[in-house]
C-alpha cells in the first residue's frame, strides 16, 4: 500500500469557524499533527464575501479544505503515504473543530501499479 486517501464531507458546520482563516490554519496544523504527519508548508486564502481554501503540504502528501460558510459546508481531502500516518485522525479533528453536525467519510487505499494489477481485471478509460 502506498497510502490512504480520505475524502470528507462536513455538513451543518459552525459558519463563523468556516470563515475564520486563522482558526482554520491552527486547526489544519493540529489535524496534521494528530495524523502523525509532518507539516512542510501551509497556504490559505480567504474569499470575498466568504469562504476559505487551505492546503497543507505534508512530507507524507497533503490536506486540503474548501469552505462554504453560507451553506455550513466544508470539503476536505486528506492523503497520507506510509504506514505510520492516520488520516482518519486528521478528519476527526476537522469534524470536531468545525462542529459538523453531520459528515460523510470515504477512505481509499492507494496502491502501486503492481498491486492494482492484481485486483483490477478491466481498466476503466477516462473520457477524452
UniProtKB/Swiss-Prot annotation:
Top-rank EC class of the record's enzyme: lyase
Q: Where is this site: Cleavage (non-hydrolytic)?
A: 60-61
One biological process term from GO is: spermidine biosynthetic process
Q: Any idea which GO molecular function terms this record carries?
A: adenosylmethionine decarboxylase activity
- Annotated disulfide bonds: none
Name the residues annotated as catalytic in the UniProt entry. 61 (schiff-base intermediate with substrate), 66 (proton acceptor), 81 (proton donor)
Look up the EC number in the record and give it.
4.1.1.50
The record's section on Pfam families has: AdoMet_dc (PF02675)
Specify the pathway.
Amine and polyamine biosynthesis; S-adenosylmethioninamine biosynthesis; S-adenosylmethioninamine from S-adenosyl-L-methionine: step 1/1
Sequence positions bearing Pyruvic acid (Ser) = 61
* Chemical reaction(s) catalysed: S-adenosyl-L-methionine + H(+) = S-adenosyl 3-(methylsulfanyl)propylamine + CO2
List UniProt keywords, sorted A-Z: Autocatalytic cleavage, Decarboxylase, Lyase, Polyamine biosynthesis, Pyruvate, S-adenosyl-L-methionine, Schiff base, Spermidine biosynthesis, Zymogen
Modification after translation: Is synthesized initially as an inactive proenzyme. Formation of the active enzyme involves a self-maturation process in which the active site pyruvoyl group is generated from an internal serine residue via an autocatalytic post-translational modification. Two non-identical subunits are generated from the proenzyme in this reaction, and the pyruvate is formed at the N-terminus of the alpha chain, which is derived from the carboxyl end of the proenzyme.
Query: How is this protein organized at the quaternary level?
Result: Heterotetramer of two alpha and two beta chains arranged as a dimer of alpha/beta heterodimers.
Role this protein plays: Catalyzes the decarboxylation of S-adenosylmethionine to S-adenosylmethioninamine (dcAdoMet), the propylamine donor required for the synthesis of the polyamines spermine and spermidine from the diamine putrescine.
Q: Which family does it belong to?
A: Belongs to the prokaryotic AdoMetDC family. Type 1 subfamily.
What name appears for this protein in its UniProt entry?
A: S-adenosylmethionine decarboxylase proenzyme
**Which source organism?**
Parasynechococcus marenigrum (strain WH8102)
Give me the gene this protein comes from. speH
